[in-house]
């Protein structure tokens, strides 16, 4: 699986060289390429932003360098070329372009699993007041464009979100996580939060591990864990519980 990230701070992505994703990159399971947006500027000042039409605070990222950068990224990936009529493209025909933004759709575990089945994912990391809106419509000629948000808060740029999404998607690629079973029992995989976990010693500072986990009865353990998932989700994430309860 290939990721391409376009940013004005390429060094921000260096953390992808460590831990499980770093190993996955070295083993060829996940391929990550980071591109400096300033390399696609055409003026001697390497300008990537300008003042907004209509006035207002801050600066807006210019469309010209983004177009050149995204054309370059689209040409590098393994996906099939875009069809002549983008509207007729089937899902999976084009690489996915993720644009982190507080005004995007929510990035979820289900979304991550969907992306893990794709060959090529690009991420456009905006800064300042964002990227010129025209870029997104134009990019649909080359990509399946998805504007995404990690949550209801604002970050300084898209790099933190890019790191989170690459890890969320990359760890679902076969071989990245050593024990595939651990992916099945995590929070959000079945619409619920994960159950609490414990390890040795059985009694620590007067706090004991729930007896059912020491019983050796796999059926009782499974039932206890399911109850804990439901109670934890109902208490901590009523929004998830409402969605789960309506499907049940």
From Swiss-Prot:
Its EC number is 2.1.1.228. CDD domains: TrmD-like. The keyword Cytoplasm applies. Gene3D superfamilies: 3.40.1280.10, tRNA(m1g37)methyltransferase, domain 2. It catalyses: guanosine(37) in tRNA + S-adenosyl-L-methionine = N(1)-methylguanosine(37) in tRNA + S-adenosyl-L-homocysteine + H(+). One of its GO terms (cellular component) is cytosol. Keywords: Cytoplasm, Methyltransferase, S-adenosyl-L-methionine, Transferase, tRNA processing. It is an enzyme of class 2 (transferase). GO terms for biological process: tRNA N1-guanine methylation. It is found in: Cytoplasm. S-adenosyl-L-methionine binds at residues 126, 150-155. Residues 227-239 have a biased composition (Basic and acidic residues). GO terms for molecular function: tRNA (guanine(37)-N1)-methyltransferase activity. Residues 224-248 are annotated as: Disordered. Homodimer. Specifically methylates guanosine-37 in various tRNAs. Belongs to the RNA methyltransferase TrmD family. This is tRNA (guanine-N(1)-)-methyltransferase. It comes from Micrococcus luteus (strain ATCC 4698 / DSM 20030 / JCM 1464 / CCM 169 / CCUG 5858 / IAM 1056 / NBRC 3333 / NCIMB 9278 / NCTC 2665 / VKM Ac-2230) (Micrococcus lysodeikticus). The gene is trmD.
């Amino acid at each position: 699986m290939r990721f391409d990230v376009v940013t004005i701070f390429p060094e921000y992505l260096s953390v992808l060289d460590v831990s499980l994703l770093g190993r996955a990159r070295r083993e060829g399971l996940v391929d990550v390429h980071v591109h400096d947006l300033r390399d696609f500027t055409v003026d001697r000042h390497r300008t990537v932003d300008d003042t907004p039409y209509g006035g207002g605070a801050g600066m807006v990222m210019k469309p010209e360098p983004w177009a050149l950068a995204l054309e370059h990224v689209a040409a590098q990936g393994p996906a099939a070329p875009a069809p002549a009529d983008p509207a007729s493209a089937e899902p999976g025909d084009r690489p996915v372009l993720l644009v982190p933004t507080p005004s995007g759709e929510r990035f979820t575990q289900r979304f991550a699993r969907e992306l893990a089945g794709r060959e090529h994912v690009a991420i456009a990391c905006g800064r300042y007041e964002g990227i010129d809106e025209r870029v997104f419509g134009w990019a649909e000629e080359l990509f399946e464009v998805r504007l995404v948000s990690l949550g209801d808060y604002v970050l300084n740029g898209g790099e933190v979100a890019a790191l989170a999404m690459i890890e969320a998607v990359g760890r679902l690629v076969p071989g990245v996580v050593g024990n595939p079973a651990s992916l099945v029992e995590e929070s959000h995989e079945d619409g619920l939060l994960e159950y609490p976990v414990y390890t040795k010693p059985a009694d620590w500072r007067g706090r004991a591990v729930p007896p059912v986990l020491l019983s050796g009865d796999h059926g009782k353990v499974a039932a206890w864990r399911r109850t804990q998932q439901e109670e934890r989700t109902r208490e901590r994430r009523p929004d998830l519980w409402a969605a789960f309860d309506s499907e049940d």
